Amino acid sequence: MLGSAGTLLLLLLAWGARALSQPDDNRITTGRNQDLNAIQQDLLLKLLSGWTDSRESNLVEVERNVPDPPEPKIPPSVKFPRLSLRERKAPCKNFFWKTFTMC
């Protein structure tokens, strides 16, 4: 999934962490430990930056492949569509025949 370079970086990172976790038997000095830490940090940063770059490029490609949704074709609505004069004056509910309207 990560590719051969990513796998190599992970193996180097795991190997370095395992070597540092073992007790110091005067084979590795403090300066070398610091060098290994710096190398591990660099490798980890390269791995993560490559991963985020590929992830961003995949997102951009996915965005390019998504077609724009078609705009709905809704006719413009009329403010008062074919209502009688009384209904246009009072667009409320009419109670009873020829009596009053209630808003």
UniProtKB/Swiss-Prot annotation:
UniProt function note: Somatostatin inhibits the release of somatotropin.
Disulfide bonds: C92-C103
InterPro entries: Somatostatin, Somatostatin/Cortistatin_C
Name of protein: Somatostatin-2
Subcellular location(s) of the protein: Secreted
Lineage start: Eukaryota, Metazoa, Chordata, Craniata, Vertebrata
Family: Belongs to the somatostatin family.
GO biological process, alphabetically ordered: adenylate cyclase-inhibiting G protein-coupled receptor signaling pathway; regulation of cell migration
Entry keyword Manganese: no
Stretch forming the signal peptide: 1-21
Entry keyword set: Cleavage on pair of basic residues, Disulfide bond, Hormone, Secreted, Signal
Residue runs in coiled coils: none
Recorded superkingdom: Eukaryota
